């Protein structure tokens, strides 16, 4: 997860005032028009009188302090779209939407629900021998195109190493918002990593050991994805993900009949409740969703933010990072932070959710970040802030930017970056950061099991906060889950049988896991443990 500096305040007014409209340049590349500062003035005057004093003051300060930054210009990624003839398959959403069938009641209905006519899916069969990533394993890459909105989402699919005809299919999503899921592929749970010499190294603990995995770069303008428009909230991104899965399973019906699971980490704590709810809202679908998994997620800020001070001040199982004075200062700031989040929860408006995010992140998160310690692992210093404290990302980025790699994958943008700070900014300043997406989890639990797991050395989405929000969640099984005790989680499937890897509690469709000795990215720090609980979860244990 990537947090913002105050230098990005300048864009708050722009994002809250008006969605970006896109003009088409003569070369076919989308270019955003210049935004007029008067839009900010007019919109501010319209809403300011209705805001609480503290929030109104925040926006007045924005206008005064950052006027010189207005207006701004936002440009899309440079890209060259490949003709359809260069792809092995092109699936038209309009064709799927046009199919009608007769139901058991004799009434005609569409075979598959959802707005799909504006979407296409382009598919390329990847030759593993050209890249050296999981040789012998069937792979596909390509783009989901929203032709109406000029959005193009990149994906890379790996078939299971074990039994692809029967093993489940899993979607993996990294967070940010704005970070590529290829980070998860090459740094965490995918079939290979890239060493400092840009050599491909196989990962024996890959999650495709017993499952087929789709890595998706979303929202648009993340990783190899691109667009002439933008997505700046989680709900809009959910429509794209539903379309991708629908068209993918239509092209590959051999996977559609198998169990499907949606998984991710960090800001995926926002994404997954929305995406799962979107899929489950459709009665007639070819997506066989069976469960959801969220690792070290941000899901319920109101319940999670009070746990930052304990985690940073020695109450999360690791030595304190902050001194007592700073810890007291965080305590003193918490009441106002929570008041702002509560107001955001009540209105879900950017005009109140943005101040909540800016104040809380400054008062509650910034003290830790100023120490130079890794916000994703309280045990280590941040080696390289530009690479999110993980220098390994530099090699991954260099490898993915090789022309031979991009050609083999059918990539249409000119370059790859692991995280797009512009996407992070847009989500934050549209108020998405603090919104109460946890409220969707009870309806999801009515239909499928949900696993919340957390590496216990992470600060930024720490295990204390994830335990707190799962215990506090109001759903029919709330009391039994909250009363359930954490029990030892042990390895059962290999030579290390009996080794403690964490703690687990479960009741009904809800499960929480604390994974020992892991930071924000559990599969990176504890690859054996992550594959252990992942395989057991897919196998139906705990639900």
Curated annotation (Swiss-Prot):
The record's annotation in SUPFAM superfamilies points to: alpha/beta-Hydrolases
Q: State its Enzyme Commission number(s).
A: 3.4.16.5
Pro-peptide positions on chain = 18-124
Which residues carry attached sugars according to the database record?
210, 509
- Identify which top EC class this enzyme belongs to: hydrolase
User: Quick one: a GO cellular component term?
Assistant: fungal-type vacuole
What is the disulfide pattern of this chain?
Answer: 179-419, 313-327, 337-360, 344-353, 382-389
Subcellular location per UniProt equals: Vacuole
Q: Which reaction(s) are listed as its catalytic activity?
A: Release of a C-terminal amino acid with broad specificity
**PROSITE patterns to which the protein is assigned, alphabetical:** CARBOXYPEPT_SER_SER
GO BP of this protein = proteolysis
What is the official name of this protein in its record?
A: Carboxypeptidase Y homolog A
> Lineage of this protein's species?
Eukaryota, Fungi, Dikarya, Ascomycota, Pezizomycotina
């Amino acid at each position: 997860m990537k947090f913002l500096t105050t230098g990005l305040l300048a864009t708050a007014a722009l994002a809250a005032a008006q969605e970006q409209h896109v003009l088409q340049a003569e070369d076919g590349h989308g270019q955003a028009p210049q935004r007029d500062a008067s839009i900010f003035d007019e919109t501010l005057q319209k809403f300011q009188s209705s805001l609480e004093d503290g929030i109104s003051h925040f926006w007045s300060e924005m206008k005064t302090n950052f006027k010189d930054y207005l207006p701004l210009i936002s440009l899309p990624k440079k890209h060259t779209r490949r003709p359809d003839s260069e792809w092995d398959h092109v699936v038209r959403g309009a064709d799927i939407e046009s199919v009608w069938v007769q139901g058991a009641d004799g009434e005609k209905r569409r075979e598959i629900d959802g707005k799909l006519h504006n979407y296409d899916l382009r598919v390329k069969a990847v030759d593993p021998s050209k890249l050296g990533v999981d040789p012998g394993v069937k792979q596909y890459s390509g783009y989901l195109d929203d032709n109406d909105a000029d959005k193009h989402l990149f994906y890379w699919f790996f078939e299971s190493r074990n039994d692809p005809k029967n093993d489940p299919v899993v979607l993996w999503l990294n967070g940010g918002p704005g970070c590529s899921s290829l980070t998860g592929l090459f740094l965490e749970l995918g079939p290979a990593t890239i060493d400092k010499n840009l050599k491909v190294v196989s990962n024996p603990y890959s999650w495709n050991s017993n499952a087929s995995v789709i890595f998706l770069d979303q929202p648009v303008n993340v990783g190899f994805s691109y667009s002439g428009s933008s997505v700046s909230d989680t709900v809009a991104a959910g429509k794209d993900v539903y379309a991708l899965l629908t068209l993918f399973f239509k092209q590959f019906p051999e996977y559609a009949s198998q169990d499907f699971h949606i998984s991710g980490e960090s800001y995926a704590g926002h994404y997954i409740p929305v995406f799962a709810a979107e899929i489950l809202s459709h009665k007639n679908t070819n997506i066989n969703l069976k469960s959801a998994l969220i690792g070290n997620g941000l899901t319920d800020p109101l319940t999670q933010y009070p746990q930052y001070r304990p985690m940073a001040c020695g109450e999360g199982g690791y030595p304190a990072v902050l001194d007592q004075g700073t810890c007291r200062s965080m305590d003193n700031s918490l009441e106002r932070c929570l008041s702002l989040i509560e107001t955001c929860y009540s209105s879900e408006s950017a005009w109140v959710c943005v101040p909540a995010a800016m104040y809380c992140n400054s008062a509650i998160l910034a003290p830790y970040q100023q120490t130079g310690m890794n916000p994703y692992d309280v045990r280590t210093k941040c080696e390289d802030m530009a690479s999110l404290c993980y220098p390994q990302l530099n090699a991954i980025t260099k490898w993915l930017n090789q022309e031979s790699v991009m050609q083999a994958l059918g990539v249409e943008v000119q370059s790859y970056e692991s995280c797009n700070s512009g996407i992070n900014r847009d989500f934050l300043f549209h108020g998405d950061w603090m919104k109460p997406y946890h409220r969707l989890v009870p309806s999801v639990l009515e239909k499928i099991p949900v696993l919340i797991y957390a590496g216990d050395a992470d600060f930024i989405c720490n295990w204390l906060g994830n335990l707190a929000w799962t215990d506090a969640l109001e759903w029919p099984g709330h009391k039994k889950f909250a009363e359930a005790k954490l029990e030892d989680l042990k390895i059962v499937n290999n030579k290390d049988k009996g080794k403690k890897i964490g703690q687990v509690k479960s009741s009904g469709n809800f499960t929480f896991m604390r994974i020992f000795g892991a930071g924000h990215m559990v599969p990176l720090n504890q690859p054996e443990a992550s594959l252990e609980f992942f395989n057991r979860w897919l196998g139906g244990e705990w639900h």
